[in-house]
Regions:
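C-terminal SET catalytic tail plus cysteine-rich post-SET Zn-binding segment of SAM-dependent SET-domain
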Residues: 75-182
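Catalytic cores of histone-lysine modification enzymes
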Residues: 1-82
Length: 182
């Protein structure tokens, strides 16, 4: 099976097949050094583009090198990834024609800092590379943040109102004290 890297309409460069690939085939292995998530976070803190692939529970990542690192995200992919015996394989979801770009759904998670816009152009595009679960988690977090902000404003307004009432009460009480002293 032949694969080649060339320009992609999805993102910069992409991985294309030069021959037909049947459904359910191991297309290519995702390879590269294995590093901890903490090491990856430190190493790539200021890098807008990475080729990291979380494996297992996510505490280890593959710093992608080789052909598979050029496989782009699509919301309507022709491949998927599968962990087999500690290795990550890109598997075909359907028959893929020669010249077709290989794609899989990145299903990103843990995305508090980046919107990870998707440019796949699929009819069912989510507009992001995050998984549906991550999108739901982010929406819930935003709602909670908005609720906390509203509650903080309410508490502040109540404190201001209370201070004004307390100030008026103190002024009246001081006026009464002055009046009784005379």
């Amino acid at each position: 099976m032949g694969l080649m890297i060339r320009s992609s309409s999805i993102h910069a460069a992409g991985c294309y097949t030069t021959s037909r690939i049947a459904k359910g085939v191991q297309v290519v292995e995702y390879t590269g050094p294995r590093i901890t998530k903490q090491e990856a976070d430190a190493r790539f803190r200021n890098s807008p583009t990475t080729y990291l692939f979380g494996i297992g529970d996510g505490s280890t990542v593959i710093d992608g090198h080789g052909t598979a690192m050029y496989i782009n995200h699509s919301c309507d992919p022709n491949c998927e990834t599968e962990e087999l015996d500690g290795r990550v394989w890109v598997m075909s979801l359907r028959a893929i024609a020669p010249g077709e770009e290989l794609t899989y759904d990145y299903n990103l998670y843990d995305g508090d800092e980046d919107d990870a816009r998707c440019h796949c152009g699929a009819r069912n595009c989510r507009q992001t590379m995050y998984s549906s679960e991550e999108i739901a988690r982010q929406k819930k977090a935003l709602k909670q943040k908005a609720r906390r902000a509203v509650e903080a404003k309410r508490r502040k307004a109540a404190a201001v109102t209370q201070a004004k009432k307390g100030g008026k009460a103190a002024s009246r009480s001081n006026a009464r004290k002055k009046a009784t002293r005379r």
